């Protein structure tokens, strides 16, 4: 079942969500540019087109008691959670000032100061670890919850079902967030799953409450998050969210991959026509006027320039520290 969520959203929240989407978009675009010019060599999985899923984190889950665990496509989640831009860029550049000390790179971000526990290159790996975090909170009677982000490809891993089942049995305080961008690298849903299968409906049959959003309206996504947060904190039960979304660029890297022909042009055009920024600008044009958008662009551009320049001036880790913070 798709659970409807209706509520009045303040102009302040609308502006905050738009700002975060725009901020993530401009940051990822800058990373794409620097990478294509060989100024960044760490492999990157960009979230351009998918920003509306991460944007509400800055409003609803910024407190450290809400702990995020993410996938290989993690920049947006880290930034949405309140992660430091300078630390992110430093990490991607392999500098000692990075959030993981320059050792993790794009796919292995960690920043406990903001409640961002990890991102991982292993498909579905964030899911069981997030359940462990939630179990720890329950045993210790700590406030807050865990949020596990993963793509549609992760639901084809056995650990996904095992963790959902375990979370239901143990009533864990966890929100599972599936970013369904329709493709696992180059393989679309139709060749990986039975025809017309809906992920949220399938998961709901296991016994977990599930919410769905088509991903075109970031305000609707915010509403689903708010509903999920209240549900988990009040009921002490897990919940599953599926957000349809779309990545504009290649699976890994800074370029378009239209030439590969695995995605129909009309499909790409549809999603770009319904870009999350465009949708908000049209729907809330009185709130998001040109003056405000120009101000946002200038503010974000200044932050990006300062952070990139500072990261470029930062030093690489010393070889003498290569064994520091290694855990086995």
Residue ranges and their predicted role:
Residues 29-32, 39-170, 188-195, 200, ...:
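Cofactor-binding active-site loop characterized by glycine-rich and histidine/acidic residues
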Residues 116-313:
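Glycine-rich ThDP/TPP pyrophosphate-binding loop and its adjacent helix/strand module
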Residues 1-54, 243, 251-328:
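Conserved acidic/glycine
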Residues 78-80, 186, 251, 321:
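Short acidic, gly/pro-rich beta-turn/loop elements at beta-sheet edges
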Residues 2, 107-109, 212-215, 238, ...:
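Generic preference for hydrophobic/aromatic residues in regular secondary structure cores
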């Amino acid at each position: 079942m798709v659970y409807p969520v209706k509520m009045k959203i303040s102009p302040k929240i609308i502006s905050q969500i738009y700002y975060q989407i725009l901020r993530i978009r401009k940051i990822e675009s800058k990373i794409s540019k620097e990478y294509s010019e060989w100024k960044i060599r760490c492999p990157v999985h960009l979230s351009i087109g998918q920003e509306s899923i991460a944007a509400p984190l800055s409003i609803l889950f910024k407190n450290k008691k809400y702990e995020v665990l993410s996938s290989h496509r993690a920049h947006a989640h880290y930034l949405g959670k309140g992660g430091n831009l300078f630390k992110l860029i430093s990490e991607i550049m392999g500098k000692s000032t990075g959030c993981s000390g320059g050792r993790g790179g794009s796919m292995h971000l960690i920043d406990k100061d903001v409640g961002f526990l990890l991102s991982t290159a292993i498909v579905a790996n964030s899911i069981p670890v997030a359940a462990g975090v939630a179990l720890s909170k329950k045993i210790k009677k700590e406030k807050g919850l865990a949020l596990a982000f993963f793509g549609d490809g992760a639901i084809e891993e056995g650990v996904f079902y095992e963790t959902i089942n375990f979370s239901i049995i143990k009533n864990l305080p966890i929100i599972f967030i599936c970013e369904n961008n329709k493709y696992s690298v180059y393989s679309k849903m139709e060749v990986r799953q039975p025809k017309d299968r809906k992920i949220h409906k399938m998961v709901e049959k296991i016994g977990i409450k599930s919410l769905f959003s088509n991903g075109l309206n970031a305000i609707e996504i915010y509403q689903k998050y708010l509903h999920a947060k209240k549900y988990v904190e009040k009921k002490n039960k897990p919940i599953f969210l599926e957000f349809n979304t779309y990545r504009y660029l290649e699976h890994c890297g800074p370029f378009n991959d239209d030439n590969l022909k695995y995605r129909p042009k009309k499909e790409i055009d549809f999603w770009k026509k319904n870009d999350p920024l465009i949708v908000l600008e049209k729907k809330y044009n009185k709130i998001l006027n040109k003056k405000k958008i120009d101000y946002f662009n200038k503010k974000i551009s200044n932050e990006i320039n300062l952070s990139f320049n500072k990261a470029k001036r930062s030093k690489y880790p010393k070889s003498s520290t290569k064994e520091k913070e290694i855990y086995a």
